[in-house]
Amino acid sequence: IPLRLVGSEMCIRDSKQAIQWMVADSEMELRAARLLTYQAAWNGDRGQDIKVDASMAKVYATEVATRVLDRSMQILGGMGMTHELPLERWYREMRIRRVGEGPSEVQRMVIARDLLSGKR
């Protein structure tokens, strides 16, 4: 994570607990998203139907990525919105990914139908 200067000190180090929590939350969410994705891939490799697993991974990973980008922009302040860093472009691209291959709401319908079908 790039560090931002606040006065004469780095933003993430030492007593900047709120920033540290944002970094920790981002890492935890990214790892969870990665695990959902790996589970879908693993089940697919075993020949299982992965429609629900893939929907869960897609919804969670894209929403986590959006939150992580938002936090990163918050941490970096005004620099997060400049063209000098790729964050603003990544944010736009991630927003598009949330609607590609079905928006998150459609993916949630796929998940809910499966859960409520009584087949699990």
What spans do the regions from the language model cover?
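Single conserved hydrophobic/aromatic residue that forms the stacking wall/gate
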Residues: 1-7, 11-12
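Hydrophobic (often cysteine-bearing) scaffold residues that line and stabilize catalytic clefts
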Residues: 57, 65, 108
